[in-house]
Every structure is written in C-alpha cells, then in structure tokens.
Amino acid sequence: MTKRPVGVIGATGMVGQRFLTLLAEHPYFEVTALAASARSAGKTYKEAVGNRWKLDIPMPEKFADMTVIDAANIDEMKKLCNVVFCAVDMKKEDIRALEEAYAKAEIPVVSNNSAHRWTPDVPMVIPEINDAHLAVIADQRKRLGTKRGFIAVKPNCSIQSYVPMLTALLEFEPYEVVATTYQAISGAGKTFNEWPEMIDNVIPYIGGEEEKSEQEPLRVWGKVENGQIVKATSPVITTQCIRVPVTNGHTAAVFVKFRKNPTKEQILKAWKEFSGKPQALKLPHAPEQFITYFEEDNRPQAHLDRDIYGGMGVTAGRLREDSVYDWKFVGLSHNTLRGAAGGAVLIAELLHKEGYFD
C-alpha cells in the first residue's frame, strides 16, 4: 500500500515533536513536509529544534535533515503533502485563519489546537465516543467551497481523564459532575529544565482550562443537527484545574450524581465493555482496552499507568460510593499522547479508513 504523504505544521514544538515520533513508522502515513514559523524556515529540522528537543525518546533520524518550510507557504506544502497535522503556537485568530487557508487549499487539517473547537461545523472528536460527528464535514465543505479540504480537531487534553468514564455511564443519566484535574507540566509544553519553579510546587490555576474542561465534554456529547454540532445540556460539570510537578499524565478526581444510580458492578462492567469504532477497525493507535480499571487503592499513578497501550488507553481507580454525590473515582490519561498528538493521529487514522482523505 502506498502511504499517504502528510505534513506537520508546528513541527518544532513539543506536540509537533510527539507527532513525528508517532508518525515515523506509521502504516498509513509518510511525513513528507515539516513546517514551522518563518524564523525556522530554511533550516534543517535538527537546526530548527536545536537544544529544544523535549521528549525522553530521541528525534527520529529520518527527519533530522529535512528542510523546514514556513507554515504560511501553503503552495509549497501542497506540493509535498495532501493532509496536515497542526500544532502551531500562535494567537487563536491566526491559527483559525491558517487552518482555514489550508482547508480551502484542499488540504485536510487534523488539529491539536483549540481555535476551531467551537466552529459549529468542525467536528471535535474523541474517536471512540463521537465519530458520528464526522458527518458535519460534508456541510463544512459546502461552507468552505471545497471538494476535499476540511478541518477536524481534538478536544482539550484535560477532559480525556474523565469524559471516557462518564460516557460509558451515560445510560445511568449523570446530571451533576465535579472534577478536579491535576495536570502535568508538558500540558504547558514545558519540561522541568525550562520551568524550575514547578519543582516542589503546585499552581492552582491554568488559564482557560476550567472553561474548556466544563464545556467541551458537552460538545463531545452533542448531536449533529442541520449540518452543525449542537452541544448537550447535561450533565452540569464544574471543575478546578491545578498544575502539578509531573512530567506527563493528567489525573482527575471526579464526583458524580446519577438520575438512575448504578451499582458498582454495573459501573465496572460498563467501563470494561466500552469501546468504539477505532477498536472495531483495529486502527494502529487504538488501545485494545480503552478504559482499564485498577482495584488497588493506590492506582492509577501517572508514573506507572500513563503509558498503558502506548499512552492511548485511559485508566481509572478508587471507585467508591460517596456521602454527598452518588459515586467518586480517579481517572488518568497521557496528556501528550491520548490527550494531544496521539488523539489527533487516531482521528486521522479513522478519517483515512472512512474515506474522508480520498
């Protein structure tokens, strides 16, 4: 099978680096173009990254000597690839314009950015949960005047630590959710070397994160109506998002009230059996088991459990009845794999299999 030529925009940043490690030996995709800011353009990838390689695995050799292109040079990118992954660090309105320009140039965009998460006809997808939202792509193409180009996005990294578990329990009608997230420093694109003030420290604020963590799940659970996604109205979610001194892995402590209160056995069965289109299609980055539950009192732990199924599975533990709410549990996801680049690659695998890139 001939691999599809793809590009990575924002290739020099942490999420861009993660994209390249995931795509280096991909069965469907071949990275043929790397793009970044104008100041990196013309340099080799190795030169452009310099001493800013942020991952604990080495830079794939095959990309080191590739020449970086200016992300704004869409004509040049179009000669080299026909799908792009986007992880640029720019102002939101600039990202919105850039992604739309690529889509209008008939290059589908799979984005890690938040700029288009609330554009009504742009699907914001966790592939196991709301693949049905891909149906709005036809309407988006009409709006953009494209035959092939479109934008698909993934949601915020924080919500992957509790939304899968809540989705598996929607039949029991959760109506009130409290979630406190404990978020790794890589969520800010940083390492301890770059952010020494996070060592031995907790910062009780992450700008914009609580609004995303409360509202984005409702869009994921929304319905497609008249060519756009209409968000769900329930459950009500309130969150606090806290930065903690962990390299990777977002943890969530969650409390839930249900209209049809399930038993512990029903909850555990729902989590164990929950799977979606990626598992049915056996997509390359689909975890065999989407939600893994640990019986041990001291799990899940970021250090031990974030890399389950290559960082694409999510884990849960400490499921207990609660004296104020009905149930409480702890969830964990890998924020730069399932929550960022890995989640976007899984979306692209699904789009590829379903014919959206043809």
Model-derived segments and spans:
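N-terminal Rossmann-like NAD(P) cofactor-binding subdomain of oxidoreductases
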Residues: 1-205, 235-236, 308, 314-315, ...
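Charged docking surfaces used in two-component/phosphorelay signaling
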Residues: 186-358
